[in-house]
UniProtKB/Swiss-Prot annotation:
EC number: 2.1.3.15
Residues annotated as domain CoA carboxyltransferase C-terminal: 32-293
Gene name in the database record: accA
Subunit structure: Acetyl-CoA carboxylase is a heterohexamer composed of biotin carboxyl carrier protein (AccB), biotin carboxylase (AccC) and two subunits each of ACCase subunit alpha (AccA) and ACCase subunit beta (AccD).
Enzyme class: transferase
Keywords: ATP-binding, Cytoplasm, Fatty acid biosynthesis, Fatty acid metabolism, Lipid biosynthesis, Lipid metabolism, Nucleotide-binding, Transferase
Name of the protein this chain belongs to: Acetyl-coenzyme A carboxylase carboxyl transferase subunit alpha
Domain of life: Bacteria
Amino acid sequence: MNPNYLDFEQPIADLEAKIQELHTASMGPSINVDTEVRALENKLRLRTAQIFRNLSAWQISQLARHPRRPYTLDYISVVCDEFQELAGDRALADDKAIVGGLARIGHRPVMLIGHQKGRDNKERLMRNFGMPKPEGYRKALRLMKLAERFGLPLLTFIDTMGAWPGIDAEERNQSEAIATNLIEMAELKIPVICTVIGEGGSGGALAIGIGDRTLMLEYSTYSVITPEGCASILWKDAAKASDAAEQLNLTARRLKEFGLIDKVIREPIGGAHRNPQQMANRLKAVLLNELEALDKVPLVTLLNQRHKRLRTYGAYENH
């Protein structure tokens, strides 16, 4: 099976392969396959729509990790008209799992911070598979405070399995770095918009995820643990990940129903990886609209609303 396709995408892969074969055949003399190609392309559109209309939570979890899914830097290249990356935590190192810097979206200057995974093995190792160490979160905090100093709105793109759990991270106080970010983000005197673009995993996601608006792409996830991790703990069997995904209620649609996020941003048919340009344009439009709306909110009201949001997380009623 093509590694760029998930198992449930195999019918799509087969149709695309047939279309490619016909295109190759049409390069020969006196061969016209336009009618057949159009028929297959129509079938492809219908089959793709059918598959993506009925996705399970586990399938959405797989899409959130799709190897071709756009990452933070991919979105930055389209969403931002200008971007100047800033590096380092000014204490130890520059964690490549977190990228951030000054940006301009349209006429709007902003600070943008996000998790960054890698495309190939070399980059995955350099980016630590998108799992930040304490210095990554301290770099993020440095940029947040810089944004506050200059009155720049803060945008964060969330896409991580979680914070790095290695001994080196624990030695440098990973939990303190995450906790400090949570405290500081709750009090930032600037508008903050957080967008889950892929995986939103546990405290590693929350450490750049406290804000005035929380958005999720349609096929992203947000959870306290991965489905595999949950299955290993509850059932001692990672193969039950699909059951765990359902129980975790980690999809954008379910989280919107619970009131834990503010907006679900629709993805192109087949997912963001099938049309990254279109997805980035949609994201840009939504971010500009949200920034404009937050411009009208007085700072005191903004902070009060942010604190109220945080206090409602985890609240429930007995029936």
